[in-house]
């Protein structure tokens, strides 16, 4: 008779049957909850699909697409210049960055990147840095509101209102400006705008210090943000995360310094970093970046010199020595009197630009700039016609949302709110 071998089950002192039974019972206690898409703490129509066990998040996934606008597809049916009015509406909190990235790509395809007037580049940088401040103010205001710091919300929107008034004085609109155009700008700064910017830059530093005094050493604020939403450099590199989330890991990566555009290499500013990899570090980075943006904006105002704001090429833009109307369609009285009354050549160019548009040589290009949320890239393809063959945007909010699971799985539900706020996603850019 053959002896039967003895089987010994060892699993940390427990029998496998007991482990399987315990695992099955634990799963029964987990529930799936939808946070959003209509929720005040998801920064727009973001849907977070949570699997929770008690108050602990065991799994989280992002559901997007609720704000899809088809902007990239629409660009294929509009002229290269008309495209500006579409891209400015993607990340609606930082429209100047959308416009500038798009126009830099068109200018590279046209081969006129080195011909942009100095004054136009200075004004572009000025508007982008003011826009960076206004965007960060919204991030801090909404993030504070979601964690119960209502005073931070009031302060943030109060300061942002001053910046939007300057935008309105310069472009005619508080948002969706379509002010940056291929070849330069839609129009020059109006009379008195330079002084308005100087007055704004005198007020902002003190107002920002008020917010810092309120939050930097606030016990509750630090308790809700320190150690929350942790994501180290390895995680950021694996997921392609950029912007304040990446710089909060200690890596000084900023495209304004790494790959300068619009003359950023001529400005004095510091790339702000932090070492803690958490929500509190991202808050500190945004606050300090606003001070650096003020420094850059002050340099811009000092650099302003009289000159054109559009390339002097009648096949690309309205004649640089003539003013265009607020809508950029060249309908100022001076312009109309010139092209309709005395210049047959001007009338021909005007007719071709309006009815057909600019012909962009065939080719493709990728351009990236540093938006308030990270690397905003645009890959555009031209087939040699008057409309893009394809334009694709690499929006930082879309990429950065990938980090939600890495930041929040294993954390508390309350910490999820702080983590998403520290990413600062804008769904217009995610879905576009």
Curated annotation (Swiss-Prot):
Q: Which GO terms describe its molecular function?
A: NAD binding; NADH:ubiquinone reductase (non-electrogenic) activity; quinone binding
- Record localization: Cell membrane
* Pfam family, any one: Complex1_49kDa
Q: Which SUPFAM superfamilies match?
A: HydB/Nqo4-like
Q: Which UniProt keywords apply?
A: Cell membrane, Membrane, NAD, Quinone, Translocase, Transport
**Top-level taxon of the source organism:** Bacteria
> Among the entry's GO cellular component annotations, what is one?
plasma membrane
UniProt keyword annotation of NAD present: yes
Q: How does it sit in the membrane?
A: Peripheral membrane protein
Which E.C. number(s) belong to this protein?
Answer: 7.1.1.-
Which reaction is catalysed here? a quinone + NADH + 5 H(+)(in) = a quinol + NAD(+) + 4 H(+)(out)
Subcellular location, principal:
membrane
| HAMAP family according to UniProt | NDH1_NuoD
Subunit and interaction comment: NDH-1 is composed of 14 different subunits. Subunits NuoB, C, D, E, F, and G constitute the peripheral sector of the complex.
- Hey, which family's this protein in? Belongs to the complex I 49 kDa subunit family.
Instruction: Report the protein's function.
Output: NDH-1 shuttles electrons from NADH, via FMN and iron-sulfur (Fe-S) centers, to quinones in the respiratory chain. The immediate electron acceptor for the enzyme in this species is believed to be a menaquinone. Couples the redox reaction to proton translocation (for every two electrons transferred, four hydrogen ions are translocated across the cytoplasmic membrane), and thus conserves the redox energy in a proton gradient.
Q: What is this protein called?
A: NADH-quinone oxidoreductase subunit D
Identify the species of origin: Mycobacteroides abscessus (strain ATCC 19977 / DSM 44196 / CCUG 20993 / CIP 104536 / JCM 13569 / NCTC 13031 / TMC 1543 / L948) (Mycobacterium abscessus)
Q: Which gene encodes it?
A: nuoD
């Amino acid at each position: 008779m053959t002896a039967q071998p003895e089987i010994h089950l060892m699993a940390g002192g427990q029998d496998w049957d007991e482990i399987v039974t315990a695992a099955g019972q634990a799963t029964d206690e987990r529930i799936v909850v939808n946070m959003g898409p209509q929720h005040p703490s998801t920064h727009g129509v973001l849907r977070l699909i949570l699997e929770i066990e008690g108050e602990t998040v065991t799994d989280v996934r992002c559901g997007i697409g609720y704000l899809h606008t088809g902007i990239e597809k629409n660009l294929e049916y509009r002229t290269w210049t008309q495209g500006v009015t579409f891209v400015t509406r993607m990340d609606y909190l930082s429209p100047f960055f959308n416009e500038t990235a798009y126009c830099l790509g068109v200018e590279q395809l046209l081969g006129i990147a080195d011909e942009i007037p100095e004054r136009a580049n200075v004004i572009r940088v000025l508007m982008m840095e003011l826009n960076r401040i206004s965007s960060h103010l919204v991030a801090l205001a909404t993030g504070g509101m979601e964690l119960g710091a209502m005073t931070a919300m009031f302060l943030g929107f109060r300061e942002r209102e001053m910046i939007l008034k300057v935008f309105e004085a310069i472009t005619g609109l508080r948002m969706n400006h379509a002010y940056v155009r291929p070849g330069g700008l839609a129009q020059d700064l109006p009379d008195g705008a330079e002084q308005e910017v100087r007055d704004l830059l005198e007020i902002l530093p003190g107002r920002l210090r008020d917010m810092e005094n309120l939050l930097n050493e606030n016990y509750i604020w630090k308790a809700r943000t320190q150690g929350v939403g942790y994501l180290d450099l390895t995680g950021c590199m694996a997921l392609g995360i950029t912007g304040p989330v990446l710089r909060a890991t200690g890596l000084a990566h900023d495209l304004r310094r790494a790959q300068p555009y619009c003359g950023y290499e001529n400005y004095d500013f510091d790339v702000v970093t932090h070492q803690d990899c958490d929500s509190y570090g991202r808050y500190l980075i945004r606050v300090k970046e606003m001070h650096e943006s003020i420094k850059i904006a002050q340099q811009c105002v000092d650099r302003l010199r009289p000159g054109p704001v559009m390339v002097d090429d009648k096949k690309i833009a309205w004649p640089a020595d003539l003013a265009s109307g607020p809508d950029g369609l060249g309908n100022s009285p001076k312009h109309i009197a010139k092209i309709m009354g005395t210049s047959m050549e001007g009338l021909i160019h005007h007719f071709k630009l309006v009815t057909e548009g600019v012909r962009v040589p065939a080719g493709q290009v990728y351009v990236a700039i540093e938006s308030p949320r990270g690397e905003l890239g645009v890959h555009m393809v031209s087939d040699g016609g008057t409309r893009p063959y394809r334009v694709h945007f690499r929006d930082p909010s879309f990429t950065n949302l990938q980090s939600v699971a890495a930041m929040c799985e294993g954390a508390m539900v309350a910490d999820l709110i702080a983590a998403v706020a520290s990413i600062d996603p804008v769904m217009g850019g995610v879905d576009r």
